[in-house]
Amino acid sequence: MSQQVKVYRQLDLRDKTRVTTNKDMIIIDDEVVSKRTQTAVTNTATITAAQLITGILDGTPTAGATYTLPTAALLVAGIYNVQVGSSFFFAVNNKAGDAYTITVAAGNGGTADGTLTVAQNVIRLFLVIITNVTSSSEAYFVYGIE
């Protein structure tokens, strides 16, 4: 019989000015802290806001692949109580059977910088920062962290 183990993260909120919660995420000051789940992705795909926010994209491409992030409008709409400066991390895990590379591309309204490719058997971390939440002008920046 298997036993489930629950892990809880303790947060010291004494020096925080604003904490917001809903069923899917916690926002502390402007940083989104969400439940982490894995999303299986194979070849070239457009990633949804929900998949991105929950944190881990497990890639098993059978050729070179591009994972396009959601548009800024969809991403802003997908973050509860979003504000300029809201941010979160996500990871791309390239579990390809051969030497196929995954490239992360910003969606419409997004800007990307840093290393955006993930080689076979590599896990790369990315940081997303919301830079505009105004309707029809939504924007974000995504950094590929080396």
What are these regions (language model features)?
Residues 15:
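Residues that line or immediately flank small-molecule/substrate-binding pockets and catalytic motifs
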Residues 1-3:
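Sec-dependent, cleavable N-terminal signal peptides
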Residues 8, 18-106, 116, 120, ...:
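Exposed extracellular interaction/assembly regions and N-terminal maturation sites
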Residues 108-111:
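Short, solvent-exposed loop/linker segments at beta-strand-coil boundaries, enriched for Pro/Gly
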